[in-house]
Amino acid sequence: MPIPTPYEDLLRLVLDRGTAKSDRTGTGTRSLFGQQLRYDLSAGFPLITTKKVHLKSVVYELLWFLRGDSNVDWLHRHGVTIWDEWASDTGDLGPIYGVQWRSWPTPSGEHIDQISAALDLLRTDPDSRRIIVSAWNVGEIPRMALPPCHAFFQFYVADGRLSCQLYQRSADLFLGVPFNIASYALLTHMMAAQAGLSVGEFVWTGGDCHIYDNHVEQVRLQLSREPRPYPELVLAHRDSIFDYTYDDVVVHNYDPHPAIKAPVAV
């Protein structure tokens, strides 16, 4: 049975048909709008194999989001530096993802824990069409070091299986999207475990899907490689989604091609 390669297929599509566009960083891109990838999470964990993805950074970043944190100090203590380019001298990033997920401010001065609210709905009203978590808080964007690229996500339950769809307004296909796919697939596994559900699909929807001009050669190298089977995720039991640690996330049989370095557009 052939290995599904929706991510690599999108890379090819953008290389072949993407429109040349300028961008905020001044780097230049090839871009397509409104693309979608689908992964059956019961068939394997969607960690890209055509280049090595740094799983440690994926896991610690997600745990950092779930902590409601927005300072890179905790990431640094665990050897993760992926947010350093945007952090202030004190390590602060403003009210980014984790703050919005766990402590969305209300006009009355209270705060909403969107992750806990989503879990409550999954347990009590799994057919709800309102199981959504948003990081796109328009009133707080000016205070964020970087406006959310992966802006909001929705959960959907059918036949005891939990699926998640992410909307990513801005998608750096070579560097960012492999991280995002793995991160939200892992989050879906965690939410499913906490709600007593099996995993269904992870659906990634991208707005501006782009390859930076200085990533084109790296993308061509990646696409020259033969994809390998996806690994298996084993997640330890925890009583709360906020109790997971790095050691609770084990990936078996990950056999990727070597990593490919590329500059980050800041």
Swiss-Prot record:
It holds the Pfam family Thymidylat_synt. It catalyses: dUMP + (6R)-5,10-methylene-5,6,7,8-tetrahydrofolate = 7,8-dihydrofolate + dTMP. (6R)-5,10-methylene-5,6,7,8-tetrahydrofolate binds at H54, D172, A265. HAMAP family: Thymidy_synth_bact. NCBIfam families: PRK01827.1-3, PRK01827.1-5, thym_sym. PANTHER family: THYMIDYLATE SYNTHASE, THYMIDYLATE SYNTHASE 1. Homodimer. Catalyzes the reductive methylation of 2'-deoxyuridine-5'-monophosphate (dUMP) to 2'-deoxythymidine-5'-monophosphate (dTMP) while utilizing 5,10-methylenetetrahydrofolate (mTHF) as the methyl donor and reductant in the reaction, yielding dihydrofolate (DHF) as a by-product. This enzymatic reaction provides an intracellular de novo source of dTMP, an essential precursor for DNA biosynthesis. This is Thymidylate synthase. It comes from Mycobacterium avium (strain 104). The gene is thyA.
